[in-house]
Amino acid sequence: MLKKQPIKRKKTLLERSSTIVSVNENFEKIDLNDYKIEYKVCKTNLGFTYICKNKKMNKLYFMKIFKKAKLLASKDIEHVTNEYLILSSVYHPFIIELRGINNTNPITLNFLYEYIPGGSLNTLLKIQKRLPLNSARFYLASIITAFDYLHKKNIIYRDLRPQNILFNKNGYIKLSEFGLAKKLENEVTFTMCGTPEYYSPEMIRKNGYNKSTDFWSLGILLYEMLIGCTPFFDSDPLKIYQKINQGKILFPKKIDKNAKLIIKHFLNMNQNERLGCTKNGIADIVEEPFFKNFDWKNLLFHNLEAPFIPEINGNLDTSNYKKMEDKIEIDDENIEIDKEKDPFYNW
């Protein structure tokens, strides 16, 4: 007697999207003499991000500059190494491209990224306070698509927040800042990192977490886009942790019912039952009423009209990024690292 074969569930386009994007083929070693620093736009834990111009091509880029001596002293080389290894091996329409590095300079380690001219979601939220439902849905779907691609490579992002979501000239988003991203070698990891208001309960409790913490952060982001603040905000970090552990979410009366539902599903305190973490994975997200009739295919191929188009005047426009005030930093001393002691030299 023939055994009845199980019916295989057809994969959604979102699940198949990882097959159309592969490794970053634009990555190369760079000559620092080809670039002119325009101005500083951002400080990270380990370095600064600048807008710079390729003098030969007359083209803008982001450049992240780390002092090697500071990296070695901080014993935090892992985050920089992770960013290099991950971004040099991924390529996706919603993830910023690492275009090259210079690792042979004895003083600095330099990462060169594509320039994303439209500013950040954080800036847009400061202007608009809260976003229309369709705008929030568009951006959330884009991030879900990027997360699905990363998760299929066993990479977790761990740093979702409006500041790290940038707009290209057409209003589509790019995830940036991969210093906290990690490729999971084991099933779980335990490090507390990211923005406290976006911490998942399992991260705070140090129970071990995986992609579950990324799905939690999607619920926090959607709430912030629609309401104008995060659901567990408090000026005291310890109270933020307490609120997250309690898991009580307060919603305004006028919030869309399907938005409220998907936020609750993402902010499920049980990480094994959380939306995106169950057996059906990403398919459960696609089938949420919040995404009913949403065109995932045309989103992926940039065929949808973005809800917000940033104002950009030419290829050299930097007006969407505020110039960071130059201050004397503790690590401004130019300490050279010998090749023999330089862990970055042979990358």
Which ranges hold each PLM region?
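Protein kinase glycine-rich loop
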Residues: 38-49
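Short beta-strand micro-motifs within the conserved protein kinase catalytic domain, predominantly
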Residues: 97-107
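C-terminal regulatory tails of eukaryotic serine/threonine kinases
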Residues: 277-347
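Conserved short submotifs of the Hanks-type protein kinase catalytic core
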Residues: 107-120
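Activation segment signature within eukaryotic-like protein kinase domains
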Residues: 139-140
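Glycine-rich ATP phosphate-binding loop
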Residues: 48-68
